[in-house]
């Protein structure tokens, strides 16, 4: 049985450029959809957060505008999260996870990762070790790729340099109303760091696979990103 550790942000606020705190956390759909798909496929799932803190759901992720104006979809996500109970509210500490303990690491999005996962002191070493093992899979969706920025090798080079990848685009950040006050933009940082960033039209489902690295553009890409991971599992794990 393949195993996956799903990493969710432990942040409940995102500090904006003007120093104001914006309520945030992990994005519901970007956790629920992959978790359900992984569970249905029989994967052994572990949930982790920085410090093992109880993660906060980004309140915006239940907004109808980000859920195809489908109230039923929002209710389904809320019910799914409630059913997980202590599995979600008492996660493993990211600091305790090891690369040899899992086949897959999946970084869940929401603006929370911009606050904590992007600067996590130990997660990067796990990501590097897994990227360097062709039998392991590293995946991230939406703002989850912010966590990939920690994956520096001992010589200082970024482990995702020259890899094709995606994540929340500048256009999407602008349309969501955060670009002007964001401390930095994910697309810009991925490009500057050396990634071969690619995207589709805003809000279109889009997943990119480059070897054992799988990334999804935004919340509507959660399903196709999880599907791409499961397809890789069938041939690598």
Predicted regions and their residues:
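Conserved, well-structured core segments that form or line functional sites
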Residues: 138
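Extended, subdomain-level signal for the structured scaffold at the beginning of enzyme domains
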Residues: 1-135, 146-237
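Catalytic nucleophile serine of serine hydrolases
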Residues: 142-144
């Amino acid at each position: 049985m393949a195993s996956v550790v799903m990493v969710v942000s432990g942040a409940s606020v995102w500090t904006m450029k003007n120093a104001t705190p914006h309520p945030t956390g992990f994005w519901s759909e970007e956790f629920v959809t992959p978790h359900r798909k992984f569970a249905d496929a029989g994967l052994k799932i572990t949930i982790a957060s920085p410090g093992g803190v109880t993660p906060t759901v980004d309140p915006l992720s239940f907004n109808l505008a980000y859920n195809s104006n489908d109230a039923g979809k929002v209710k389904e996500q809320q019910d799914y999260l409630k059913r997980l109970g202590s599995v979600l509210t008492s996660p493993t500490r990211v600091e305790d996870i090891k690369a040899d303990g899992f086949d897959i690491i999946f970084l869940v999005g929401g603006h929370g990762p911009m606050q904590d996962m992007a600067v996590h002191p130990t997660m990067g070493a796990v990501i590097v070790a897994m990227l360097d093992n062709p039998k392991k899979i590293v995946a991230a969706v939406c703002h989850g790729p912010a966590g990939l920025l920690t994956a520096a090798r001992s010589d200082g080079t970024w482990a995702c340099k020259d890899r094709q990848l995606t994540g929340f685009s500048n256009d999407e950040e602008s349309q969501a109303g955060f670009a002007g006050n964001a401390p930095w933009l994910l697309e810009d940082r991925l490009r500057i760091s050396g990634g071969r960033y690619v995207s589709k039209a805003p809000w279109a489902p889009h997943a990119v696979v480059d070897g054992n690295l799988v990334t999804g553009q935004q919340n509507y890409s959660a399903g196709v990103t999880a599907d791409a991971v499961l397809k890789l599992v069938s041939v690598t794990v």
